[in-house]
Amino acid sequence: EVTDSFPEPSKAPNPVTAICIVTPEKQCIVLATKNLDRKIQSKIQKQIDEHFKSIGEEFSFIFKCFDNEYDMLYTFLATFVKKFSMMTGWNFVQFDWQYIVNRCKKLGIDPSIASPIARTFGKHEFPCHVGVMDYLDIYAKWDKTVDIKEDFKLDTVGEAVVGIRKIKYEGTIQ
């Protein structure tokens, strides 16, 4: 849920309203707590098609709506993450994963359900079976393609390195 300020992941004050998973099979799977009608889903698919046309890639859009945040987070961990071999993202470790784990704790969901052996490791409580790679950390330390880094926002870096910005979504997921 979006508020006027950027939320502190250790406190996770606002509900998670959507999660996007991009698979190796080029599927953009969106889990959300607000339903999107077919017209909006079709519009999103068209935006995805247009966005990736310049690099010759095609991705499919799959949408799954849940009645509440608890059901969405539980399904994400117990169904999706449990099958992952790898989790990646931009600022994924310090923000996304920490926020999800802390929201789960507030809702009474044990993060270890994401692991086939019901175990997590480290201060971030990653499932034991999953490799984790944060692209922001890798870029900040190893990137040599951009001499002067304006900032570390995903939009800025994507444009500078590969010429692609984030897909703009004009609607709301609240």
Description of each model-found segment:
Residues K149-Q174:
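C-terminal or mid-to-C-terminal helical accessory/interaction module adjacent to the motor/catalytic core
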Residues D37-K149, T156:
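Conserved DEDDh/DEDDy metal-dependent 3′-5′ exonuclease domain
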Residues L31, D49-S60, K166-I173:
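Short beta-strand elements in bilobed, periplasmic/extracellular small-molecule ligand-binding domains
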Residues I19-I21, H51-F52:
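Short polybasic amphipathic segments
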Residues K26-S42:
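Short, solvent-exposed beta-strand-terminating loops
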Residues E1-C20:
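Entry/capping segment at the start of metal-dependent catalytic domains
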Residues T3-F6, C28, Q94-Q98:
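Flexible loop/turn segments at secondary-structure boundaries
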Residues V22-P24, E159:
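A generic structural motif
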